[in-house]
Amino acid sequence: MTMMITTGNSFEGKVIKQYLGIVRGIVVRSPTISQGLMGGLKSIVGGKIGAYSEMCEHAREEAFQLMIEHAQALNANGIIAMRYDTGEIGQAGTEVLCYGTAVII
């Protein structure tokens, strides 16, 4: 079954038959020692920290997939109002939350 996902509150041309509630995927990541060292050096001289960007992108994708799995467990075929949120966990960890409202269309 294909999961339709939007950041909007509806799907154009579709009728939402049932709202199933909030679904989410949460991932907490921290950089490896080498990523931390390289990131520290880059923060001194400036520039893009590629290892951190890659780590964050993987965390977002994993959180997104976990949100879809949560919606599938509710037999949803759509997610509306999808959002990302991030936060720090301690000094070394980053939390990525992906959430939305599961629906049947």
UniProtKB/Swiss-Prot annotation:
Gene3D superfamilies: Hypothetical protein apc22750. Chain B
Native organism taxonomy: Bacteria, Pseudomonadati, Pseudomonadota, Gammaproteobacteria, Legionellales
Any single Pfam family the record assigns to this protein: YbjQ_1
Naturally occurring in which organism (per UniProt): Legionella pneumophila subsp. pneumophila (strain Philadelphia 1 / ATCC 33152 / DSM 7513)
Domain of life: Bacteria
Coiled coil feature spans: none
Family: Belongs to the UPF0145 family.
Protein name: UPF0145 protein lpg0197
